[in-house]
Amino acid sequence: MSRFHFFILVLLVSISGFSQGMLLPVISIIFETNGESAAINGLHATGLYIGVLLASPFMEAPLRKLGFKPLIVMGGSIVILSLFGFIWLQSVWVWFLLRLFIGIGDHMLHFSTQTWVTSMSSKQNRGRNLSIYGLSFGLGFAAGPFMVPLVKLSPSLPFIVSGCISLFAWLFVFFLQNAYPETSPHETKSDNSFRRFYQAMLFGWVAFMPTFGYGFLETALNGSFPVYALRLGISVDAVAIILPAFAIGSIIFQFPLGILSDKYGRRNVLLVILLTGALCFFIAGVFPSPYVIGGCFFIAGMAVGSTFTLGISYMTDLLPPHLLPAGNLLCGITFSLGSILGPVAGGWYMQTFESANLFYFITLTLSSVWLALVLGKPKSWSPAETYSSSS
């Protein structure tokens, strides 16, 4: 993979991060201002991730048949059209459908670029390359919440800016030469996507726990935290600063953690960062002032902001090359399940319990993922065992 090729993939994922980082807080603020309930706000945020889940079972076969580039082109076009749709279609449930379409398009883009990077990276450089990939997404995601103040000028303005930037980045896709994922000589015509999903889950299930936890954390913070912060008396402008603090912390440590994972192992690094993140959110729950919360978000971002990319790297270490497309899809599926559960559970928690503390809820989630990694023992694979398990 050439540097220019890698740069285009990194650019695409950074713009995707920007649109996602903008959507969650902007729509949450618009709905809270319009008097929508926390439960509706949380449920609405699941639209993007429901789109991911709906599309996931049908992604692997087109990728193997068409290659990486066509899926990126189609995914990017769906995202761009949907972003501009927010400008013209003013309805809570139409916006939910637009979020769902963005989920489908974003997943096509992420799945293709992510599988392209993992399949082209050596084991020695995998952590570094995926950390750069994650860093680019984090940079975009960190920039997204800065669109929140534009809502004061016009509710449509954040969507216009995001749509135009996404269109510009999408045009670079046409400089890429198409390629196809690796296949195995042991595969037969009877092997299908669902069988490969089963094999990937059998040998790499423990690596999907961090991606689930990160999905829960990301949407709980970006979907439920703005509502929780407003109820604490924290201003919208302060929320626009606190939220990017997590992503900025993630950006700072994304690359060093990738290097450390190449040296000391993905599992060991994941155990340390998950425990650190849980402690940070516990402290934020005990001392809920804007300055303490901002500091805890920053430090937690330095730790758990790399959980998703380290989970992908760990999955790539555990699975054979021909199962990487299925493994990458399962990373996206588990991330989406966590992302759906995050805002729904967070919204329900805040609406049901009068003195609910969102940060304790997040602490419990991260601690549960840490415990799963401690107790989980991945199953080693061999070509003979892999195919006998599917027969």
Swiss-Prot record:
<dbReference type="InterPro" id="IPR020846">
    <property type="entry name" value="MFS_dom"/>
</dbReference>
<feature type="transmembrane region" description="Helical">
    <location>
        <begin position="239"/>
        <end position="259"/>
    </location>
</feature>
<feature type="transmembrane region" description="Helical">
    <location>
        <begin position="292"/>
        <end position="312"/>
    </location>
</feature>
<dbReference type="Pfam" id="PF07690">
    <property type="entry name" value="MFS_1"/>
</dbReference>
<feature type="transmembrane region" description="Helical">
    <location>
        <begin position="131"/>
        <end position="151"/>
    </location>
</feature>
<keyword id="KW-0813">Transport</keyword>
<feature type="transmembrane region" description="Helical">
    <location>
        <begin position="269"/>
        <end position="289"/>
    </location>
</feature>
<feature type="transmembrane region" description="Helical">
    <location>
        <begin position="7"/>
        <end position="27"/>
    </location>
</feature>
<dbReference type="InterPro" id="IPR047200">
    <property type="entry name" value="MFS_YcaD-like"/>
</dbReference>
<feature type="transmembrane region" description="Helical">
    <location>
        <begin position="329"/>
        <end position="349"/>
    </location>
</feature>
<comment type="similarity">
    <text>Belongs to the major facilitator superfamily.</text>
</comment>
<feature type="transmembrane region" description="Helical">
    <location>
        <begin position="197"/>
        <end position="217"/>
    </location>
</feature>
<dbReference type="GO" id="GO:0022857">
    <property type="term" value="F:transmembrane transporter activity"/>
</dbReference>
<keyword id="KW-0472">Membrane</keyword>
<dbReference type="GO" id="GO:0005886">
    <property type="term" value="C:plasma membrane"/>
</dbReference>
<keyword id="KW-1003">Cell membrane</keyword>
<feature type="transmembrane region" description="Helical">
    <location>
        <begin position="39"/>
        <end position="59"/>
    </location>
</feature>
<feature type="transmembrane region" description="Helical">
    <location>
        <begin position="156"/>
        <end position="176"/>
    </location>
</feature>
<keyword id="KW-1133">Transmembrane helix</keyword>
<feature type="transmembrane region" description="Helical">
    <location>
        <begin position="92"/>
        <end position="111"/>
    </location>
</feature>
<dbReference type="InterPro" id="IPR011701">
    <property type="entry name" value="MFS"/>
</dbReference>
<keyword id="KW-0812">Transmembrane</keyword>
<dbReference type="InterPro" id="IPR036259">
    <property type="entry name" value="MFS_trans_sf"/>
</dbReference>
<protein>
    <recommendedName>
        <fullName>Uncharacterized MFS-type transporter YfkF</fullName>
    </recommendedName>
</protein>
<feature type="transmembrane region" description="Helical">
    <location>
        <begin position="356"/>
        <end position="376"/>
    </location>
</feature>
<feature type="transmembrane region" description="Helical">
    <location>
        <begin position="66"/>
        <end position="88"/>
    </location>
</feature>
